């Protein structure tokens, strides 16, 4: 703990602390080593018990800089974290481009007849993934889902 999204001075990041050592590094890197040295927060169990206080302190510190700063600083010390991207940021990501992970799917409602989707990151040499079903429109399957899950029909 913590394993969640945090606001920064500009865009959000996700932090995924997996052990007490990573928590100490997180606190040191954000300039708040006293959080980790508090006996109530020294262990994961203690942090879970005092979640609201821990999260409030971390949020306040992380709001002092932007996401690029924190992702670089925390990554440099081994604290798992990453940016929370918008869809346009996902499609512009250098790794997404390098791995050719953008798939243009035909879509009747799209302005140019196609909508970009993110490809499966797992690649099989003998059984490549096939993309056959276009993404649904908002509420396109709502009636079927309500009927299947709740037995209701509008």
Each language-model region and where it sits:
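Residue-level detector of short coil/turn "hinge" positions at structural boundaries
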Residues: 34, 81, 103, 153-154
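Aromatic-enriched alpha-helical interface/lid elements that frame and gate functional surfaces
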Residues: 1-77, 81
């Amino acid at each position: 703990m913590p394993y969640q999204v945090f606001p920064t001075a500009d865009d959000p990041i996700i932090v995924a602390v997996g052990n007490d050592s990573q928590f100490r590094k997180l606190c040191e890197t954000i300039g708040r080593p006293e959080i980790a040295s508090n006996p109530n927060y020294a262990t994961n169990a203690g942090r879970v018990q005092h979640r609201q206080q821990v999260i409030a302190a971390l949020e306040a510190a992380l709001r002092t800089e932007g996401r690029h700063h924190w992702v670089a600083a925390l990554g440099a010390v081994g604290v798992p974290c990453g940016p929370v991207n918008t869809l346009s940021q996902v499609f512009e990501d250098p790794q997404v481009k390098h791995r050719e992970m953008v798939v243009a799917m035909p879509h009747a409602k799209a302005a140019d007849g196609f909508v970009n989707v993110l490809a499966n990151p797992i690649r099989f040499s003998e059984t490549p993934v096939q993309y056959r079903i276009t993404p649904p429109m908002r509420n396109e399957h709502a009636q079927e889902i309500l009927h299947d899950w709740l037995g209701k029909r509008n």
